[in-house]
Amino acid sequence: LMDVHAPQSEREILVNGWFGRGMPDLNQKNRHLARYLIQNSIWWIEYSRIDGIRQDTHPYADYDFMATWCKEVENEYPDFNIVGEAWYPRGTASAWWQRDSKMNESNSNLKTVMDFDLTFTCQKAFGDACSSREGFEAGLFKIYEVIAQDFLFPDPNNVLVFLDNHDLGRFMQKGESDLRRYKQAIAFLLTTRGIPQIYYGTEILMSGTKAEGDGIIRTDFPG
């Protein structure tokens, strides 16, 4: 949506097209449906007493509706947090989606976005940090280059930071025996800016790659 070169036809496909063959879209431009979805969300928050929601594939929904949805939910629950999955390999695009972004002509009202740029960088950087490679193209310097762009985010402290999740291969790969990389990465995750997310199983070194399938990286926690 932020691409100034994108034709209107592609924008409509992104927002109005089905996400998958078994995932039909709801017409969130319909005011009756929009009101139902907002009220239904508020009801479930009240009923379940949850503290936050991760909104999957946030950019694929109707922008104006999602901005209204975020605002009305926050009006009801000021301390509630909404995390939008805006999956972009560069932080510049993720920053566009955060609330009060100077790059966005309108306001998304989305408090927290996911920092996929830092995730992918960590997966590479900590591997380099345990090797003999040196220089400005290896190791932790890659991470420095990412967080040096934090001026793009309206609020870097409300960015979700993570090493892996249910859509990615686990940070601890199968057969890996070097715990130094793992410990260093966890230490960074828990001390850098933003809100740390730890995927279940990380604490017991669960492993698995995306190539093995989602069923492997989403294996039940043992016990």
Where are the language model's segments positioned?
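Short, solvent-exposed helix-loop connector elements
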Residues: M172-E176
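Alpha-helical scaffold elements lining the catalytic groove of polysaccharide deacetylases
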Residues: Q28-N40
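Substrate-binding cleft of carbohydrate-active enzyme catalytic domains
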Residues: L1, H32, I45
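Conserved interdomain hinge at the start of the Helicase C-terminal
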Residues: Y182-Q184
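Acidic/polar loop patches that form or flank catalytic/metal-binding clefts of enzymes
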Residues: G84, I195-T202
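Active-site-proximal helices and loops of the catalytic beta/alpha 8
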Residues: N40-I42, E46-P154, V159, S177-L179, ...
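Aromatic- and acidic-residue-enriched carbohydrate-binding clefts of CAZyme catalytic domains
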Residues: L1-Q28, R218
